[in-house]
Amino acid sequence: MELPLSQATLRHTLLLLPALLSSGQGELAPQIDGQTWAERALRENEHHAFTCRVAGGSATPRLAWYLDGQLQEATTSRLLSVGGDAFSGGTSTFTVTAQRSQHELNCSLQDPGSGRPANASVILNVQFKPEIAQVGAKYQEAQGPGLLVVLFALVRANPPANVTWIDQDGPVTVNASDFLVLDAQNYPWLTNHTVQLQLRSLAHNLSVVATNDVGVTSASLPAPGLLATRIEVPLLGIVVAGGLALGTLVGFSTLVACLVCRKEKKTKGPSRRPSLISSDSNNLKLNNVRLPRENMSLPSNLQLNDLTPDLRGKATERPMAQHSSRPELLEAEPGGLLTSRGFIRLPMLGYIYRVSSVSSDEIWL
């Protein structure tokens, strides 16, 4: 007498029955949530548990999970058997935390009897709110009043976002824009939204709003200035030009300073102050320097009376003593201190000339 099946065993048997009927006699076919191939939309960071079931065969099946080709550890796994070895099956559960980098989940089965593999796949469609990667504007002078503005925004979103351009006063300027899907392999979910419009005022602050089923994101553009529309000078060019101007100014200032210093040196000239070397307390000797007339002078202890010609013999009446404070004169030619040429000799000083003058009796040179 056979024992009645329990309710739990009956329920699992009914779940495995569609897989057993679809797989055919002697073939094992895993299914994920009742389907061999499916696509599942998940929001980013959402947790979802997938269940892989297999039915049929005479041996115990082996199930394994692969996420983007990487082997994963199952959350739970359970084997079923009904009526001994005549009917067997199993289930395995794996929980996924959705990330935008995830693409495909596979449940792989290795049939112990035939050795042939079988797979069930789920394509993961991870959705997230829009992200504005870059926003900008290009301004051009329009034929009419105002500015011709080309607005562009790089938006990354899944599903694709609807982009709206709004001005500072609130009303919608443009509610639709042309968009271009970029390289989907290198830049997934990235689109370029571009719109062209004409502004009548320069004081506009524009903003872009991107929306999809997951969320809303906005970004603002600076007000287009008049200088930005007419002058576009790279920052590097400004820095280089400033450096060149500063270097030129410093070089010119240095050149002017050098010229001024040279001119002052030429104006002053070399020092002409003579250096006197005292060889004796009564005798003075000039260095080999030619003195200008205004700097030449007689010895400090020389008096003009000593050089006055006295043909009547006054010079002989005033003998010169060795202890006198005045310097001794060289012996004059016969006839007095003056020579026949009109000058006298002083020790080691050369000649002193006497010439006639209009303003005075005589001038000593």
From Swiss-Prot:
Cytoplasmic side: 254-365
Classification via InterPro entries: CD80_C2-set (IPR013162), Ig-like_dom (IPR007110), Ig-like_dom_sf (IPR036179), Ig-like_fold (IPR013783), TMEM25 (IPR042864)
Coiled-coil residues: none
GO cellular component annotations of the record: extracellular region; late endosome; lysosome; plasma membrane
Signal peptide: 1-26
UniProt-listed Pfam families: C2-set_2 (PF08205)
Keywords: Cell membrane, Disulfide bond, Endosome, Glycoprotein, Immunoglobulin domain, Lysosome, Membrane, Secreted, Signal, Transmembrane, Transmembrane helix
Tissue specificity note: Expressed throughout the brain with higher levels within the hippocampus.
Residue ranges of every copy of the Ig-like domain listed in the record: 30-123
Chief place of localization: other
Transmembrane segments: 233-253
Glycosylation sites: 106, 162, 192, 205
Cellular localisation: Late endosome; Lysosome
Disulfide bonds: 52-107
Positions in the Extracellular compartment: 27-232
GO BP of this protein: negative regulation of excitatory postsynaptic potential; regulation of protein stability
Oligomer and partners: Interacts with GRIN2B.
Described purpose of this protein according to its UniProt entry: In neurons, modulates the degradation of NMDA receptor GRIN2B subunit. Plays a role in the regulation of neuronal excitability.
Protein name: Transmembrane protein 25
Organism per entry: Mus musculus
Organism phylogeny: Eukaryota, Metazoa, Chordata, Craniata, Vertebrata
Encoding gene (name): Tmem25
